[in-house]
């Protein structure tokens, strides 16, 4: 989550003209369409959020160009960024949610860093949880980050925005559920890393950065408490969200990206399969002798059919 300065803001929705509404509508469409597609077609929600955030960011960049050309006025997203000292009534509570879908248009690494985590960590986590439970975890991280930033900066007039709380929430949830899963991630080297290493590395770095910002009073344009809030909230609530899900907590099969996970699934199927060696052939069922020329092929057929992928 990034911080901005109040002087960047100039307009609110009550002052929108046609151009502003068109640009805002395009931003909503860019964000919502990929997510809607994933829900309707049962594809990866994590990837659709990644695409939606990136497309929405591109619309924000278009908005900056439009502002420079004076096609629209001022800073378009004023009503959707999180400003702690204005959340003193119900009118601004929506910014605890909406700020998580905006990113700093001045720093492309802000959105790129978030979507990298959401894609690489979110996809295997979604495979563990299923779409609905993953959506719940994502929102828990988003709200947890926003609430933490609000609580630690009650009187601050500085706006913040970004999906970092949700991204860190994915780390926290994965650590709570399946810490020994291995997922591909570019940490020093691009290779598979155990989730516990990745999550604790990112969490530890944020604790250090938060200390240097708050404890040592060093300047920072990053809302570190939002990152920590998203991580902790998702970590604490993951056992509740994951209850009754596709995988038991703590299962050690290497993770959804490993072949061991597929073997585990096949073994689970096989455990409830009927033993084909006990199957009754048509001749025996009619109390007839099996013809000699059929006995060996029949025995081979029953043996080869006793696997999940040949049933």
Where would I find each of the regions flagged by the language model?
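A detector for small-residue-rich transmembrane helices and their helix-helix packing motifs
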Residues: 2-279, 283, 293-297, 301
């Amino acid at each position: 989550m990034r911080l901005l300065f109040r002087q960047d803001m100039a307009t609110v929705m009550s002052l929108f003209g046609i151009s502003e509404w068109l640009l805002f509508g395009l931003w909503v469409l860019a964000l919502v369409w990929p997510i809607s597609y994933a829900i309707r077609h049962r594809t990866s929600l994590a990837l659709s959020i990644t695409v939606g955030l990136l497309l929405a960011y591109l619309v924000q960049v278009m908005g900056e160009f439009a502002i420079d050309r004076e096609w629209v006025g001022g800073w378009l997203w004023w009503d959707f960024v999180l400003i702690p000292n204005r959340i003193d009534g119900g009118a601004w509570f929506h910014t605890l949610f909406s700020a998580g879908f905006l990113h700093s248009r001045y720093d492309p690494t802000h959105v790129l860093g978030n979507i990298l985590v959401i894609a690489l960590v979110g996809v295997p986590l979604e495979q563990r949880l299923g779409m609905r439970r993953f959506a719940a975890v994502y929102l828990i991280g988003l709200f947890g980050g926003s609430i933490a930033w609000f609580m630690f900066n009650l009187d601050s007039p500085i706006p913040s925005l970004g999906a970092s709380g949700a991204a860190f929430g994915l780390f926290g949830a994965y650590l709570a559920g399946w810490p020994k899963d291995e997922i591909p991630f570019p940490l020093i080297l691009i290779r598979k890393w155990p989730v516990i290493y990745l999550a604790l590395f990112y969490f530890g770095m944020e604790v250090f950065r938060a200390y240097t910002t708050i404890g040592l009073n060093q300047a920072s344009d990053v809302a570190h408490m939002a990152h920590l809030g998203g991580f902790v909230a998702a970590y604490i609530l993951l056992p509740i969200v994951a209850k009754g899900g596709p995988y038991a907590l703590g299962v050690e099969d290497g993770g959804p990206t490993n072949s061991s996970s597929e073997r585990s699934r096949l073994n689970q199927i096989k455990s409830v399969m009927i033993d084909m060696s006990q199957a009754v052939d048509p001749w025996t069922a009619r109390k007839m002798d099996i013809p000699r020329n059929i006995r060996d092929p029949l025995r081979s057929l029953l043996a080869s059919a006793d696997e999940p992928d040949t049933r």
